[in-house]
Amino acid sequence: MVKEYKTITQIAGPLIFVEKTEPVGYNEIVNIKMTDGTVRRGQVLDSSSDIVVVQVFEGTGGLDKDCGVIFTGETLKLPASIDLLGRILSGSGDPRDGGPRIVPDQLLDINGAAMNPYARLPPKDFIQTGISTIDGTNTLVRGQKLPIFSASGLPHNEIALQIARQASVPGSESAFAVVFAAMGITNEEAQYFMSDFEKTGALERAVVFLNLADDPAVERIVTPRMALTAAEYLAYEHGMHVLVILTDITNYAEALRQMGAARNEVPGRRGYPGYMYTDLATLYERAGIVKGAKGSVTQIPILSMPGDDITHPIPDLSGYITEGQIVVARELHRKGIYPPINVLPSLSRLMNSGIGPGKTREDHKAVSDQMYAGYAEGRDLRGLVAIVGKEALSERDTKFLEFADLFEDKFVRQGRNENRTIEDTLEIGWQILTHLPENQLGRIDNKYIQKYHPAHRKAK
């Protein structure tokens, strides 16, 4: 028998506090019956005492203490079906594209199940994004979680859409899909995302979840879990390689802070909840490859660093959980370079597992290391030139200074719709390395110089 409680004791922000007489489950879905007969949905946040804390998805405006509360005994579920592909949904899974509701094959708990560490396989297959600074120097590997650290005013949304359009697993027979979840975005950004997916045809292999800035903060906490549940369904039920792009994790963390404040929790660093690390881990750790499963889940969470501060708790904690970072730099953006990715502080910890013979090319690691070394030295020399002038540099130093400019102009810079293969990326790398004297290519084995260096290929 379903019981309806009329025991709301307090309404605070997006939360209601309900007195209970029977056990209630954590994350349980709640139906709130308004006095005018309409029904709102909520979710149990805390059931440890006689007072249950419920977050209301549609907000508490118009609620009063006479409203009825029904505990359903169910958690929030995603209606999962292969028909999810090609759809644009709200942050809580309702259609936003004017289409019909999804007819589910399964109803899946959005909180997911913990992945058995013993069943995890180490990531080892290359994912081609078509962006040289990622593919060439900070390679994304299937099953990896590799965040993009950006900042306000930088083109991380454009980079996210470019990756969503272009990403593929070369040589794989399994289908590839993208799950794109945007949190706390403006109506203008939502229109931009929707039109880009539809215009470029990328929507055919994508599932898009959009949570707007004026949607309840509660929905923002649900959105990435909806997206990851959809990704797991496509990966493990349909054998697809799924790339999940989550933007912007900073808006998600702000919603966590807002909910924590409404519950009068003791704040942690900079006002964020003390459990934020654990909460972020419940999202990031859902990436991976499971033994015996054909599909896989790869994650690119995107976060904007408040005040360009990489030590801020959100990027700081994300860095501990994930396997590297791609750093978007304001300095390169000011120069008009797109994508403005600074490879020096960027890192892909699993890169070596996904490159080399049979995956990309035998010279990939050597070319990447040499470009890193040359660019780092060229950047250092820019600081020296600012003090002593270019005339004081030796011929060798001048070559490295020019190499840094070439690297930014030819390798980093590319068009918003330019999809480079890994062969294109390595070829551009070799072309700019010809600017350095051959005796300075100390990080590249001589056999690769003989085989791939443009000067030697012409001689043959």
Swiss-Prot record:
One of its GO terms (molecular function) is ATP binding. It is a peripheral membrane protein. One of its GO terms (cellular component) is proton-transporting two-sector ATPase complex, catalytic domain. InterPro entries: ATP-synt_VA_C, ATPase_a/bsu_AS, ATPase_A1-cplx_bsu, ATPase_F1/V1/A1_a/bsu_N, ATPase_F1/V1/A1_a/bsu_nucl-bd, P-loop_NTPase, V-ATPase_su_B/beta. The keyword Cell membrane applies. Its main location: membrane. SUPFAM superfamilies: C-terminal domain of alpha and beta subunits of F1 ATP synthase (SSF47917), P-loop containing nucleoside triphosphate hydrolases (SSF52540). CDD domains: ATP-synt_V_A-type_beta_C, ATP-synt_V_A-type_beta_N, V_A-ATPase_B. It is found in: Cell membrane. GO terms for biological process: proton motive force-driven plasma membrane ATP synthesis. Keywords: ATP synthesis, Cell membrane, Hydrogen ion transport, Ion transport, Membrane, Transport. It holds the Pfam family ATP-synt_ab. The keyword Transport applies. PANTHER family: V-TYPE PROTON ATPASE SUBUNIT B. Has multiple subunits with at least A(3), B(3), C, D, E, F, H, I and proteolipid K(x). Belongs to the ATPase alpha/beta chains family. Component of the A-type ATP synthase that produces ATP from ADP in the presence of a proton gradient across the membrane. The B chain is a regulatory subunit. This is A-type ATP synthase subunit B. The gene is atpB.
